[in-house]
């Protein structure tokens, strides 16, 4: 108060006022502070001071032709005096008002195109619904989130090239547009922005928003997709949340969601195939998500999820160095350990070989619904601080941490035998065996763990073996916290290796990911996922396998046909028949296969009844390992629509129906395509009459000398082979029959065999 009174007294003297308003500021330090560098030191003051002047704006001389000297009220809009130090004109703020009201108008057609992201945001907010506000403690954890909805996923460099090409097409500088998405976007934007009058720099900024993913590390409780993040400030505070449903979806969120589903499906499918890694790569390369190749999306999309990271590792891309266990992402924040193999005994006296981590370590554990901080020593949990959405989520985190700690009391809590297997019927490794066991039932684990009295610490409470909160006691070393644990913020990526069984390791050999870590959650993808690989036919169920298998045979009939007669074993081993085996009753697979292979062999040799439709129909059955048997079948069973349905060996059935008139095949009532060649008996031509007594083996084979004419054939001995010129001017290889009894069928067969050999 004293100071203020003193100042008031000073101000009342006229001399003080004069000193403060008239004298120059000549202290060098002050002048330096406000004049050095281009950076404005006090922008607000500068603005106020400038706007108080009559002509605070300078403009190009051309403005004098475009704006009158005075407005309707007679106020001066610009001054004839030049701006000191340049040949620009001094202009009044009133000129801006005049220009806005009376200046030239331009076409607005480009605005929604350039400012697309803003227009779309307004639409989403207009159609979004805001629910009630709830006051409660918010457990927020920092996660890396996508902050601009509606973007493509180009890298900064790719986007830069696209922007330069669209906005400054005539600038020099090498720009190589390689990826499909780059080319598509460039073409689309060039068309959209023809004759655009918006300042190029502005267009460039807006394009960047549209093309590049921008992420920030933000505290979030709830939805993390970009349409939720754009309203984060409206939906969650420190002690309140407001319910919100977005008024529209954006492609980038849909891509992320669909990518996770595709990756999970592919990893699950690859696990059960003979060579998981090769199968996984084949599927990644042949899958499209929303019309874009999955491998392109994987290269550009930073989504971190177990299955997605396994696919990235297989493609040789870098991934995050954190590892996954029990669906939680672990990041070591302190300490170190060495691995030693130890044998331990479970409560059921089963021996397990586990890799023990010796040493003190600290980890953060982050899951979808719970997070934790874990401190552990060799086979001992020292402290676990958990926070989660609900009791269930907290329990999940506690189980994972207890198993991860490798404590003896956890291993002794096992009741019964551990024999969990993965999808391919292989035993899981011991750590996952333990995890599965306790995820099924953790009662004994929690009961045996032990409890301890707890101190009263702010924001922490205890949790009892039955998962109820307590202020006095808690599971040994375990506390529940109100505060979440932040996700690992670094975006650093490391080089990893992957083995045949899809186990991903860092360069120190630590396992970061394995198929056991891939979530079993099923979801419906937002974008269409097109799996071209035959391995994924079964994703849509047995009917799809059946239809796809027959469609594949018909589409590739030309090559299948040749392999059928010349290299059947290679044909039977084709990957495309793999899925079909799951439809054939296990007990019958090898019998069916033996029967069909024998039948085919007879068609090739003696009987000569080459029947296209029958080959197509029975071929998938021949793919199983055959059992030699003399069994005959008139129909073969496949398991579809929840029961066994029959395919007739001779003739049509609801499962496999060939229409001779239209030459189209329907499988389970679905069209499976048309046969390009005529499988009917047809009319036997002249050759077939003449070739009676000869078996057509296939195409010309030079080892059997020059082609004979049909008349010269009669000189061949039984069993002798020769090339023969037939009427179409084609050469085929034939063999004179060793026995005469099958001569009758030769004439029917010859037509087809010739056709086949020629094709």
Curated annotation (Swiss-Prot):
A biological process from GO: symbiont-mediated suppression of host gene expression
Keyword annotations from UniProtKB, A to Z: Cap snatching, Eukaryotic host gene expression shutoff by virus, Eukaryotic host transcription shutoff by virus, Host gene expression shutoff by virus, Host nucleus, Host-virus interaction, Inhibition of host RNA polymerase II by virus, mRNA capping, mRNA processing, Viral transcription, Virion
Positions of the record's site feature: Avian adaptation: 627
Motif interval(s): Nuclear localization signal: 736-739
InterPro entries reported for this sequence: Flu_PB2_2nd, Flu_PB2_6th, Flu_PB2_C, Flu_PB2_CAP-bd, Flu_PB2_middle, Flu_PB2_N, INV_PB2, PB2_helical
GO MF: RNA binding; RNA-directed RNA polymerase activity
Subcellular location per the Swiss-Prot or TrEMBL entry: Virion; Host nucleus
One protein family per Pfam: Flu_PB2_7th
Main localization, broad class: virion
Tagged with keyword RNA-binding: no
Signal peptide interval: none
Any one GO cellular component localisation term in the record: virion component
Matching HAMAP family: INV_PB2
Family statement: Belongs to the influenza viruses PB2 family.
Assembly behavior: Influenza RNA polymerase is composed of three subunits: PB1, PB2 and PA. Interacts (via N-terminus) with PB1 (via C-terminus). Interacts with nucleoprotein NP (via N-terminus).
Protein role: Plays an essential role in transcription initiation and cap-stealing mechanism, in which cellular capped pre-mRNAs are used to generate primers for viral transcription. Recognizes and binds the 7-methylguanosine-containing cap of the target pre-RNA which is subsequently cleaved after 10-13 nucleotides by the viral protein PA. Plays a role in the initiation of the viral genome replication and modulates the activity of the ribonucleoprotein (RNP) complex.
Protein name per its UniProtKB record: Polymerase basic protein 2
Lineage, broadest ranks: Viruses, Riboviria, Orthornavirae, Negarnaviricota, Polyploviricotina
């Amino acid at each position: 108060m004293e100071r203020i009174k003193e100042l008031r007294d000073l101000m009342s003297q006229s001399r003080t006022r004069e000193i403060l308003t008239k004298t120059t500021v000549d202290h060098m330090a002050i002048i330096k502070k406000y004049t050095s560098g281009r950076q404005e030191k006090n922008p607000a003051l500068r603005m106020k001071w400038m706007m108080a002047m009559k002509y605070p704006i300078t403009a190009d001389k051309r403005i004098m032709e475009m704006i009158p000297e005075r407005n309707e009220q007679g106020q001066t809009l610009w001054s004839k005096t030049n701006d000191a130090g340049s040949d620009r004109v001094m202009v009044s703020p009133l000129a801006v008002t005049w220009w806005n009201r009376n200046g030239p108008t331009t076409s607005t057609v480009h605005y929604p195109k350039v400012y697309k992201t803003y227009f779309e945001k307004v639409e989403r907010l207009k159609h979004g619904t805001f629910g009630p506000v709830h006051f409660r403690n918010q457990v927020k954890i920092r996660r890396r989130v996508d902050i601009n909805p509606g973007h493509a996923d180009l890298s900064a460099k790719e986007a830069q090239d696209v922007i330069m090409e669209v906005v400054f097409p005539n600038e020099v500088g090498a720009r190589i547009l390689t990826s499909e998405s780059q080319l598509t976007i460039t073409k689309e934007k060039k068309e959209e922005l023809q004759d655009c009058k918006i300042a190029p720099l502005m267009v460039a900024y807006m394009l960047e928003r549209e093309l590049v993913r921008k992420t920030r590390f933000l505290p979030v409780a709830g939805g993390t997709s970009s349409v939720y993040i754009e309203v984060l400030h409206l939906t969650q505070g420190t002690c309140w949340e407001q319910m919100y449903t977005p008024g529209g979806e954006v492609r980038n969120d849909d891509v992320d969601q669909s990518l996770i589903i595709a990756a999970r499906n592919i990893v699950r499918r690859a696990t059960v195939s003979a060579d998981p890694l090769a199968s996984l790569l084949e599927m990644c390369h042949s899958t499209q998500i929303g019309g874009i190749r999955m491998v392109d999306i994987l290269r550009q999309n930073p989504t971190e999820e177990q299955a997605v990271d396994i696919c990235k590792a297989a493609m040789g891309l870098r991934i995050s160095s954190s590892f996954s266990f029990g669906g939680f992402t672990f990041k070591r924040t302190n300490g170190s350990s060495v691995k030693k193999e130890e044998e331990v005994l479970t409560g059921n006296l089963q021996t397990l070989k586990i890799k023990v981590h010796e040493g003190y370590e600290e980890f953060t554990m982050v899951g979808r619904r719970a997070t934790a901080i874990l401190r552990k020593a060799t086979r001992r949990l020292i402290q676990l601080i958990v926070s989660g959405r609900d009791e269930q989520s907290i329990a999940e985190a506690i189980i994972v941490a207890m198993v991860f700690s490798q404590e003896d009391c956890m291993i002794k809590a096992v009741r019964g035998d551990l024999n969990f297997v993965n999808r391919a019927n292989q035993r899981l490794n011991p750590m996952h065996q333990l995890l599965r066991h306790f995820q099924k039932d953790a009662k004994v684990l929690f009961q045996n763990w032990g409890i301890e009295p707890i101190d009263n610490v702010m924001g922490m409470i205890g949790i009892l073996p039955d998962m109820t909160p307590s202020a006095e006691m808690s599971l040994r070393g375990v506390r529940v916290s109100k505060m979440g644990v932040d996700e690992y913020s670094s975006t650093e990526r490391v080089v990893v290796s992957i083995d045949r069984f899809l186990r991903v390791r860092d360069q120190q050999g630590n396992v970061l990911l394995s198929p056991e870590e891939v979530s079993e959650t099923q979801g419906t993808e937002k974008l269409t996922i097109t799996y071209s690989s035959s391995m994924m036919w079964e994703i849509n169920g047995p009917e799809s396998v059946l239809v796809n298998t027959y469609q594949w045979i018909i589409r590739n009939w030309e090559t299948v046909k040749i392999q059928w007669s010349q290299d059947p074993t290679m044909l039977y081993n084709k990957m495309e028949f793999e899925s079909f085996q799951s439809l054939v009753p296990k007990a019958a697979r090898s019998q069916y296969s033996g029967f069909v292979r024998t039948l085919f062999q007879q068609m090739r040799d003696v009987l000569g009844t080459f029947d296209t439709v029958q080959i197509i129909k029975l071929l998938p059955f021949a793919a199983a390992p055959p059992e030699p048997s003399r069994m005959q079948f008139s129909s073969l069973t496949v398991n579809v629509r929840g029961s066994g349905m029959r395919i007739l060996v001779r003739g049509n059935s609801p499962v496999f129906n060939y229409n001779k008139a239209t030459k189209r095949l329907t499988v389970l009532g679905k069209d499976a395509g048309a046969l390009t060649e005529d499988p009917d008996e047809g009319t036997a031509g002249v050759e077939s009459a003449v070739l009676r007594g000869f078996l057509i083996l296939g195409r010309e084979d030079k080892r059997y000398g020059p082609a004979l004419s049909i008349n010269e054939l009669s000189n061949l001995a039984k069993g002798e082979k020769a090339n023969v010129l037939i009427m179409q001017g084609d050469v085929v290889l034939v063999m004179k029959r060793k026995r005469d009894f099958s001569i009758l069928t030769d004439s029917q067969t010859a037509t087809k065999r010739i056709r086949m050999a020629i094709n």
